[in-house]
Amino acid sequence: MSTKMTGSVKWFNETKGFGFLTQDNGGNDVFVHFNSIQSEGFKTLAEGQRVSFIVEQGKKGPQASNVVAL
């Protein structure tokens, strides 16, 4: 079962459509792809923005899914 986490955006590159999130619990930074952002229209995140997300195992390591701006 996946656990909902909270954290903030470390950085996000709008042009490339990916970035990294910092977990509030102090865990490793988590990769985030724009396809995982739950919003309407242009999907992007701002540095320092608060988010909730689920950490899943991606092909290259931990990856965020179901990312929602708080």
From Swiss-Prot:
User: What triggers or suppresses the expression of this protein?
Assistant: In response to low temperature.
Q: Which GO terms describe its molecular function?
A: DNA binding; nucleic acid binding
What stretches pass through the bilayer? Answer: none
Report the residue ranges that make up the CSD domain in this protein. 7-67
The entry's localization annotation reads: Cytoplasm
UniProt-listed SUPFAM superfamilies? Nucleic acid-binding proteins
List the GO terms this entry assigns under cellular component, sorted alphabetically: cytosol
Q: PROSITE patterns from the entry?
A: CSD_2
| GO BP term (any one) | regulation of gene expression
Q: Which InterPro entries match?
A: Cold_shock_CspA, Cold_shock_domain, CSD, CSP_DNA-bd, NA-bd_OB-fold
| Signal peptide extent | none
- Which keywords, in A-to-Z order, does the entry hold? Activator, Cytoplasm, DNA-binding, Stress response, Transcription, Transcription regulation
Q: Which domain of life is it from?
A: Bacteria
Query: Which Gene3D superfamilies does this entry report, sorted A to Z?
Result: 6.20.370.130, Nucleic acid-binding proteins
Q: Report the Pfam families cross-referenced here.
A: CSD
Q: What is this protein called?
A: Cold shock protein CspV
The uppermost taxa in this organism's lineage are: Bacteria, Pseudomonadati, Pseudomonadota, Gammaproteobacteria, Vibrionales
- What gene name is given for the protein in this entry? cspV
